[in-house]
Regions:
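Conserved positions within compact, well-structured domain cores
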Residues: 1-156
Length: 156
């Protein structure tokens, strides 16, 4: 994981403070393919599964911490019973963000999304479309074409 000390903050027009890159990216993007970052299973902690090269398993879990670093396949959720409240705020049980940051709400990112590539790369906040890992077989898919908007917002 990239330490928040190695990043810069970007302030949006609403005053929200964002980390300057995709979570897990080693650098700020200078193209649409050089700073994808990690691929997280929704609401799962940063336990190693987010690495693009982590192993995989089909065993789902009933707990909030699987206790291994494998990407969980075979279901649309890594938990036996879905729990979509584990990333809530900087103190969220499974918050994958560096200290002081959190995953923003949908409302916070709605006005931030830029769909024009030229405009996106002239802005201060550059977030390439990282793709995703297929939940059936863990293979990488749609790099540069698709990206879930898992951005980091600083709590203030």
């Amino acid at each position: 994981m990239v330490d928040a000390l190695d990043t810069n903050d970007v302030v949006d027009p609403n005053g929200n403070i964002w980390m300057d890159r995709n979570l897990g990216a080693a650098q700020v993007a200078s193209s649409s393919t050089d700073a994808y970052g990690n691929l997280y299973q929704w609401d799962r902690a940063a336990d190693g599964h987010e690495s693009r090269t982590s192993g995989s398993t089909s065993a789902t879990f009933a707990t909030d911490a699987p206790g291994h670093t494998d990407f969980i396949t075979g279901s649309s959720d890594w938990r036996t019973t879905q729990n979509d409240n584990l990333w809530q705020g900087v103190n969220g049980v499974n918050n994958p963000c560096p200290t002081g940051y959190r995953v923003p709400t949908e409302a916070e990112i709605t006005g931030l999304v830029i769909t024009n590539t030229a405009t996106a790369f002239s802005s201060l906040l550059k977030l390439p479309l990282a793709g995703y890992r297929n939940s059936n077989n863990s293979l990488l898919a749609n790099l540069g074409v698709f990206g879930y908007k898992i951005l980091l917002l600083q709590e203030h």
